[in-house]
Amino acid sequence: MLGLPALYAIVDPLDTRRPPAALAAALLAGGARLLQLRLKPPISRELLAAAEAIRPLAHAAGALFLVNDRPDIAHAVEADGVHLGQEDLPVAAARRILGRGRIVGVSTHDVDQARAAATAGADYVAVGPIYATTSKEHPLTPRGLELVRAVRGVVACPIVAIGGITAETAPLVRAAGADAVAMIGALVRAADPAAAVRAVLAGIG
């Protein structure tokens, strides 16, 4: 079974205008050992250029590197895997593009979706939003820690909790059953993203 670092750091500049590669470097400097590249809107050339810049940084630091939504770009840059949304390609199709030995994770928002993703062979399921988030244009209703507990009861694969998680709430989310906590805004909007990573890791190990 896949072993995930406790912090799942998402590289998305949001409204900061920080270059993705610079953000990635800062997160890695703080101790992040898993990065997912997420750009909205996902313009292909921009996503490819950012992925090409970040993958060597991640691998030099001994970190896993995933690309959001796009298994083709993940394959092109030899990323460690891809993260799929509910409207993206099925797990099996993504695996055909990526080849063997790559990670495929899936976003889920309820127990049924999580069970379906695990049954389809996802290496991990992301569940959320746990808390209110400002990182999505049209956020769903927060589901709270109960969603983590419920999904933990029906899947054997690792669970990544996402949505409005902060350094203060991350330990609670882990205690509810999440193997990892995914964070965007609390890291990339911080004045010092590296320090923000260190603060999170100090609480969750």
Give names to the regions the model predicted.
Residues 1-88, 96-124, 140-146, 150-159, ...:
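Conserved N-terminal beta1-alpha1 strand-loop-helix module at the mouth
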Residues 131-133:
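A short, flexible beta-alpha/helix-coil linker loop
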Residues 135-137:
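Glycine/threonine-rich flexible loop motifs
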Residues 176, 180-183:
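C-terminal binding/interaction regions
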